[in-house]
């Protein structure tokens, strides 16, 4: 599969993420059979020190120039705080234009460590006294939204207002439990840039909490939920780039330097042009010079772009987990979901995607962590195979009728939504279709255009799909973004919700990790919504003189505010 659908919930987390060990992509480059190659390993120091991004000093790069890039879908909702707007494509394209809401006041480095972004935050401290946890920080008084509204305590309160009510608040958000634990947010001694947050109960998952902000106008629910549909309203944003033009009919977004940007580093590029393209189009676009760089994971793209004059292929480890994902409000029978997971041969699915490029990796068993991260455990149920799946269905009252099981006159089955016409995507569906048929489960292919992904996934207009989520650097913190009833539209388990709540109340980091793994094991057995089957590599084909751009582990274009100001062209 050459286009990976990726969400990364890290931008909704509360702050610092713990340092995890990172993986080394070994034996990269051309092999004897001319595959992209690569193997997941565990040498953190070598990987972080040898990122393939054409690293260059900011001061040595050309001032000016244009960078032409593509994503699989732009919009239609450009508010990256909403369920439908929060997609990797939108974050990639506009996340760096809205730093306070997308990545907050801290930057994430390749190894997963946070550091203060002094363009927004000058001082920070958190402490717990007599059981009461407080955080205080000073916002850079130069920080403003593009319409001149200050980024101050009112902006932090606005973010709190939007998220504190969870999924029942009337805002179309991905719920974030942390914000509901805040008791108060106030200015210290009347200074609107000196913020104090008091927690109702201590929150121990992070040493940096509450360092996000939203334009106060976004408290208006209509503006928040629908105001950004086909309208990238950057007057409510703040960052080094702003929107120069949005061409809705051509699906082209042009970013230009923000004249209101106060940061020490100014953008190097005159323009970043984003275009919505499907795999065939972006492969051709790179080959004919219409694009300056493309990111991919599949053999078809590699075979198209390899050996092109004036370009190179930069290789890295994806910090993602590919998964089979149910919408449990549509596929409501737990037995059917559990049987599907039992019948799925995950190794075969991974081979469909990665064997053609010669990539090797251990089978992932978690949505919460990469196999090389501290605390990782394989939490996928071990009772698998067609016979195990049949037993689950029969114990739930299903009986075989012809080739498939039935219950109450309904065939055991569901639709899998796929996107585009990529050969690997089709092969993956066909592979899973045959696997499930052996267990008496019938699946159909709800194939849709690539451009529909954002709206379909964001509004959960599917029964099941092949998805991919970004992996956070803090295993324990990630559990709340996958395994609560609130995050899964009311589907879940009360015992699991209590365990998730206990994680943030537990001070010991080791105990947090143990609880998070316990949560994941229980959820896969008792709820069965996410089934991981691959992590995979990441390749970027780029023009050779493009600097500071390429696979960077946990440091992405939407987790590090310095990313885009450092991207430029060598003379």
Positions of predicted regions on the chain:
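Ligand-site clamp/hinge motif
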Residues: 257-304, 442, 450
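Alpha-helical secondary-structure segments
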Residues: 68-71, 151-159, 192-196, 240, ...
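Ligand/substrate-recognition segments at binding pockets and active sites
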Residues: 248-250, 399-471
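Detector for C-terminal structural segments
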Residues: 18, 25, 344-375, 424-433, ...
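Surface-exposed binding/hinge segments that line
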Residues: 62, 68, 136, 173-222, ...
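N-terminal lobe/hinge region of extracytoplasmic solute-binding protein
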Residues: 67-128, 161, 236
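Aromatic- and charge-enriched surface segment that lines or borders ligand/interaction sites
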Residues: 123-169, 194, 332
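Gly/Pro-rich hinge or "lid" segments in bacterial periplasmic/extracellular proteins
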Residues: 88, 99-100, 107-111, 210-267, ...
């Amino acid at each position: 599969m050459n286009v990976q659908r990726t969400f990364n919930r890290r931008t909704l987390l509360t702050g610092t993420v713990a340092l995890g060990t990172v993986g080394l992509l070994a034996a990269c480059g051309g092999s004897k059979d001319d595959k992209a190659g690569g193997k997941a390993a565990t040498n953190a120091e070598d990987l972080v020190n040898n990122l393939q991004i054409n690293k260059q000093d900011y001061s040595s790069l050309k001032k000016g120039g244009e960078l032409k890039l593509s994503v699989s879908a732009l919009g239609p909702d450009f508010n990256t705080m909403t369920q439908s707007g929060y997609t990797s494509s939108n974050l990639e394209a506009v996340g760096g234009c809205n730093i306070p809401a997308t990545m907050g006041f801290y930057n994430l480095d390749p190894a997963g460590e946070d550091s203060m972004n002094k363009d927004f935050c000058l001082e920070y401290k958190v402490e717990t006294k007599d059981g009461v946890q407080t955080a205080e920080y000073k916002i850079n008084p130069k920080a403003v939204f593009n319409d001149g509204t200050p980024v101050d305590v009112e902006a932090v309160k606005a973010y709190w207002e939007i998220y504190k009510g969870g999924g029942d608040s009337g805002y179309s958000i991905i719920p974030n439990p942390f914000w509901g634990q805040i008791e108060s947010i106030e200015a210290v001694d009347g200074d609107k840039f000196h913020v104090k947050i008091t927690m109702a109960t201590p929150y121990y998952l992070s040493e940096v909490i509450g360092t996000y902000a939203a334009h106060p106008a976004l408290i208006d629910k209509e503006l928040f939920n629908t105001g950004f549909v086909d309208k990238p309203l950057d007057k409510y944003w703040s960052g080094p780039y702003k929107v120069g033009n949005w061409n809705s009919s051509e699906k082209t977004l042009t970013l230009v330097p923000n004249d209101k940007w106060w940061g020490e580093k100014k953008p190097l590029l005159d323009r970043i042009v984003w275009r919505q393209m499907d795999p065939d189009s972006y492969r051709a676009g790179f080959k004919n010079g219409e694009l300056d760089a493309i990111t991919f994971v599949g053999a078809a793209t590699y075979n198209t772009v390899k050996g092109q004059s004036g370009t190179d292929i930069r290789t890295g480890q994806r910090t993602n987990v590919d998964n089979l994902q149910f919408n449990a409000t549509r596929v409501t029978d737990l037995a059917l979901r559990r049987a599907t997971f039992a019948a799925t041969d995950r190794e075969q699915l991974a081979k469909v995607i990665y064997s053609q490029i010669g990539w090797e990796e251990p089978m992932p068993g978690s949505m919460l962590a990469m196999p090389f991260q501290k605390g990782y455990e394989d939490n996928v149920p071990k009772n698998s195979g067609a016979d195990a799946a049949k037993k689950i269905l029969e114990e739930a009252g299903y009986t075989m009728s012809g080739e498939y099981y039935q219950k109450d006159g309904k065939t055991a089955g569901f639709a899998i939504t796929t996107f585009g016409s990529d050969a690997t995507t089709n092969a993956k569906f066909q592979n899973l279709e045959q696997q499930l048929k052996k267990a008496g489960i019938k699946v159909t292919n709800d194939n849709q255009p690539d451009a529909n992904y954002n709206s379909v996934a964001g509004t959960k207009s599917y029964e099941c799909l092949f998805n991919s989520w970004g992996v956070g650097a803090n295993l324990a913190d990630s559990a709340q973004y996958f395994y609560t009833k609130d995050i899964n539209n009311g589907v879940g388990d009360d015992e699991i919700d209590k365990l998730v709540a206990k994680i943030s109340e537990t001070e010991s980091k080791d105990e947090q990790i143990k609880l998070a793994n316990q949560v994941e094991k229980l959820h896969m057995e008792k709820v069965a919504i996410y089934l991981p089957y691959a992590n995979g590599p990441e390749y970027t084909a780029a023009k050779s003189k493009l600097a500071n751009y390429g696979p960077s582990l946990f440091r992405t274009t939407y987790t590090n505010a310095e990313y885009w100001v450092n991207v430029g062209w060598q003379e």
